[in-house]
Amino acid sequence: MPKTVITDELYHYCLDKGVREHPALLGLREQTQAQLKNSQMLISPEQGAFLAMIIKLTNASSYLEVGVFTGYSTLWAALALPNKGKIVALDISDEHKTIAESAWNTANVKDKIEYIVAPAKESMQSLIAQGQYFDLVFIDANKSQYLEYYELALQLVPSGGVIMIDNVLMYGQVLENNPSKTYIKTLQKLNNLIKEDPRVDICMLPFGDGITLARKK
């Protein structure tokens, strides 16, 4: 079947017609891109809109984010959650906490967000020990630990809960036959695991840098 080629012009048309980016989101994205050399770590606006839509479609009220960076995806989630919704945001560093919290304050959603600075695996294990559950878990952190994050996330969502994983295509490097980079090997293993995992329903989407949705049965 014929396929639509997404040119830069068509991509920007999609952003213009299909994404409603809150002023606080736009300001945070532009600030991150202007000030940080690693701004490519941001999710794209359409990924943020997709995340927000998943939250609303599933009526999620609790959200766990593994990897915060400057809080752009966190802000998309916070704006989509109901007023009494809760977010736990995990990051190994507080380097960008000031930028993130400023944007969250601007959007009046900071009270929804608990920011935990520690290795994500430790934090996730602690949340499991506390008996906490989340309607949606978004994984966007150290790619070399994605297998561990996925298994821990499965313990943190109830039946019907959703795990959303970013960067599953890693700029096409997942196609390499013998990758030299450990994190590429990990992503390949993860993608193979999820494809055959009877515990979840799955969908991999080729936008942004690739997103996988896994719904726990």
At which residue positions do the language-model features occur?
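A short alpha-helical cap/connector motif
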Residues: 1-136, 143-164, 168-217
